């Protein structure tokens, strides 16, 4: 996107001086947002970007052939609209990135509520040449419904999250990190070009793969724990579980190609649905064969035959699971912790792990079929894809 320098996006033009490069020229900055059929929420995002304290940036929308009024929303706020033929976030971003000539690229999604100092707080760190990329945490916005806040608490629980990075808030101003979610991050364009941008055809976990590529090239990633991006959570129950199935599926397939992003917990969670079904069948057997008799409750005395073991051991493990979920939610990082959301955390953690495990199982089948090649399969999501 050569040619004339774009007009500042923010209404408060000049409220913060532009960030300068070593040669004294201002960094050319863009916010890149991939979108599809989500014009109303995109309107909120662009409205917030139009009021940023740092106004020296361009907004670029990579639109995968939306059938709603997305283009009109872009024109309303003066954002650059690009019609993109792809069906996944990685390819949508790549399509735009290959046309851009900016120095810094900030990434977010079309369902966020950017704070009015979000751009300022991200770009300020790039006066340090050691910073290759920087990001921040993301939580559900305050106006999300109760169910979405329950999902946020489950995502940000201290335990039970299968290695996810939601809500990470390490201590310090700028902390080294191995991954920043693509909803709240900024990269140097030179580094993006060096690694040839996102992995083509990556149907999910594309931000994790990108960060792995950038670190392979020797560049450093950081997180600013104070720069929080409110990001809408999927509502229970179908959209929430569909998203979690997609996370499990796409992460495991990506892990096959990029071993350095793999964690043992990603594989372990694939056995969760099998363990749950086995435990319930054991309890059913134990209950039907006398293992749940009244005199066997709240006592360790007496004979522990197979019926008693089959009923009470799984029941005890369920109680421990609930207790760990409660504890993890209570000491987690979500700002939406309350008596209600913490109380329901075991349910939301269970649903997330069940769905994530289903996604992992689907990924195992995909890997056996294709070897986990990029561009194979299709993501599981709740968007209407018209590209």
Regions found by a protein language model. Give the residues of each.
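Membrane-embedded multi-pass helical conduit in multi-pass membrane proteins
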Residues: 272-369
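Glycine-rich, basic loop-to-helix element that forms the pyrophosphate-binding segment
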Residues: 84-100, 171, 175
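Conserved donor NDP-sugar-binding/catalytic core segment of glycosyltransferases
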Residues: 117-153, 228
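Short aromatic/hydrophobic "clamp" motif used to bind/position activated sugar donors
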Residues: 105
